Amino acid sequence: MKLLRKRVPQITRLMCIAIAFWVAAGFTAFADVKGTILDKEGEPIVGATVLVKGTQKGAAADLDGQFTLSGVDANATLLVSAVGYTPQEIALKGRTDITITLVEDSKVLDDVVVIGYGSLQKKQVTSSITSIKADDLAAGIGGATVGTALQGKIAGLSIDGTNSPNASSSFQLRGVGSVNAAQSPLIVIDGVPGGDIRLLAQEDIESIDVLKDASAGAIYGTRAAAGVILITTKNAKAGNVRVTYTGEFTTDFIRNKPDLLTADEYTKTVANATDWGYDTDWYDAVTRNHPFSQQHMLTLQGGTDNLSVYSSLMYKDAEGVVIGDNRKDYSGRINATYKLWDNRVEVGVRLQAREADRDQRGGEGTVGTAMRYNPTIPLMSVNEPTKWNVDEAGAGAAGGTPVSNIEYQYNNGKDQWLLGTATLKIRLYDGLNLQGSANVDRRQYQGVYYEDAKRYSSIQNNRAGYASHSFDKTTNISYDAYLSYLKEFGENREHRLDAVLGWSYWDSARETFSANNADFSINGIGPWNLGEGTYLKDGNAGMSSYKSPTNRLISFFARANYSYDDKYMASASVRREGSSKFGANNRWGTFWAVSGGWRISRESFMDDTRDWLSDLKIRVAYGVTGNNSIPTGITKPRLTNDAGGWLNSATGTFFNSYGPANNANPDLKWEEKKEFNVGLDFSLFNDRLWGKFDWYTRDIDNLLFEVDAPQPPYVSNTIWRNVGSMQNKGWEIEVGGNAIQTKDFTWTSTLNFSHNSGKIKKLGMEGQYIDGDGFPNPGNPGSPVRLSSGSPLGKFFVFRYAGVDENGNIQIYDKENNVVPATGNNINSSNRVYTGNSFPALIVAWNNTLRYRNFDFGLQLRGWFDFDVISQPSMYQGLITGTGGNNLIKNLYEENKHIKGDKVLCDYFIQDGTFVKIDAISVGYTLNTSKWNKYLQKTRLYLTLRDVARFTSYSGVNPEVNINGLQPGIEKLDGSSLYPQTIHATFGVQLTF
């Protein structure tokens, strides 16, 4: 008993402890858990499911992404999932209020690809299509335009443009597609064809899908010969209203300033140089140090299960590195969708307006002029040092100075865009939908120009100022209506049919007006009071207006995609299209395509590879598309009063004169492109690594071109004809993957390669040819481009350099390989050869995104390999004679100083332009601020450097010349390649509420 009495207190204590643990455990077992499920943008994921692992207990997230679970064990694990996101297991560890962030599923085969009038999962695609999502487009490219952001992202797509805020980008997909008709891909924005990519803000874009081959683009008919770029803008998701502000602040640093001769070096070096006694760095005079640009973007989105609204406002103020080259943009967009009657009817509206105010006094031409200008001419007036020099000390003979010509003018352009579409979608039956849209695309340009009375051109023409005012408006209207049918059938739903049948109408009309006058009594009032100038009463003022014939297209189209067991796929499309541009005999064309795919990885004999081979698919496609990109009204005779008229000064009566405007060709017909494409798609290691390979060949027949016509019998000196055929072919490789993927660190990398070559198969009659633009005076050396039957595209047509004679004059080889002087009868086309290659043998781009916890880092590299550039700066600013007194670039002069004679268009001035470029480096940090402020969900700070560095052995100014079109590879004196090369430094902040 004593022993028992001694142990009672101990037993009691043990029982109390056990009861305490039991009570605590009991309370924990019945605790409530609440939480919020968000995507990586901080937006609620409506309908996400949460299950307690090992139980049947679960909940779904509401419109705010919130959920509540009752009676959950403190050590339970939650299974969280949502469609399109990677499932997660979350250990509670006693927490009762949690925030869960899901990331999008990396299963690339389930990604949705937008195609003509519909969409497909990537695994079902049988054509060559490259897709870019919003995150991939924007990654690491702060402060960029859409065109700049696309650079290096898509194999086979080449983009040309400059750093000028007023420059536009030109696009070319898979090489040259025509000798004169449209060579740029068709831009389709939210289903509206013919869009202008300058209209869009990068933040508004949801995805970009590039249809590369004819089988993908044939359903767009006549305008898809050069490929199609489909751009889809953002829709709001159901859930709370989300507001995002993005501010970007950019400055530029000139990184590769040409080393020009100083005034002293100039007078000692350049033949017949005139020394005006001053030393002016004209390159510095026309450029700015660290111009400042800013952009502010505000987006608001939200909605319910039935209504969603996305809207945005944007303001941008950009200063160019060249004086007189500035731009301000204002943009607004609203996308709204409303579903009613149990989702059987869906109504949508998308509307965007944008305005750009452009100060376009300076630009590409300004830089070239400044680089060539005599450095001994003073910047400021000799007699009035506070004013710009206009015509003193040699400036008059040189046409005024580059600076005074900018400062003494007003040159403003205003671009206005309006893009709107209204859609109606009706679910007629399970899988059967009727959809229609009405679209408007209106663009207007207003140009206002005033030349000050103090400007050299006014002084030269003895007039007190010159003014002009112009308008140019284009309105495109289109309507679409189509039935779409989607059905899965069979015992295991192994058959899938996706079909479209529709009709389309599109028309375009253009109107222009311009007027000019000169010699105003009050300097500066001219643009806004044109009638006040004296040129009107003297009969020297000008006025013109124009209304184009309406360009109409009517189309009927159909497409069917079939797949069996996600293993065998086939697709076919056809479009019957009529164009008002052609005569009655050739007005209608039929464009069609077929393609097929085989997912070998799903075959039973591939079972042993499933642990590492996620997917392997072979694609084969063939399609025919057309091209009608020629002026309207050329198949019928027209009258014009371009000859002007005459004024009866005695009576004050003005008489118009009319005459034939063109040589009509009623037999003109469509260009036709036939394209064959073979492709291979693969993904490895549970989609950690993916890629694709494409090989293609294109044949373009019935080439449209404006050729010379003899007078007489023709009334005009040119006529449009179908002149021949051409071919291009090439290959593309795209590889990407999540190289590293851990809880805290991910590295995503993509690499693409492309190659293209082409030739003219036939061009007109025997011996006919087309020459490119001639090089400018002085010297008039001719054009380095000639197209003729059998000629390769991208080759230069020049003389062969054979050294210099004892006097330093260039010698060439004639057609018999004899060394002859480059003079007289030796300068003829029979002594020229095709040489070099202005199309890169290989274009490579490597894009990387690394994320460590809240930090992100981006690196983008791009290279053009084994291509040639012919340098106008080397010919015009590297020789001491025949330059018209141009200033020289030192390194080019050092290379060429053995040449004492005039320039000759020969292969001496061609050199390898191979380069590797760091397109962008970025670093960012994202801070989850919701824990401190319930309204501010997320803050992101980032710094981006664009156009960081270029590595090349090219000795000219810039090897990154235009490689689009029929005259590629030329570094021009006034071209985009001479616009200052700058490093763009952008600091950005993004706030999500």
What is each stretch, according to the model?
Residues 1-334, 338-354, 419-420, 670, ...:
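Short, small/polar-rich motifs associated with maturation and membrane association
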Residues 47, 71, 111, 131, ...:
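Extracellular/lumenal ectodomain signal focusing on beta-strand-rich modules
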Residues 147-151, 720-727, 769-796, 829-830, ...:
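C-terminal extracellular loops and terminal segments
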Residues 259-262, 451-453, 515-518, 766-767, ...:
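Short Gly/aromatic-enriched secondary-structure transition segments
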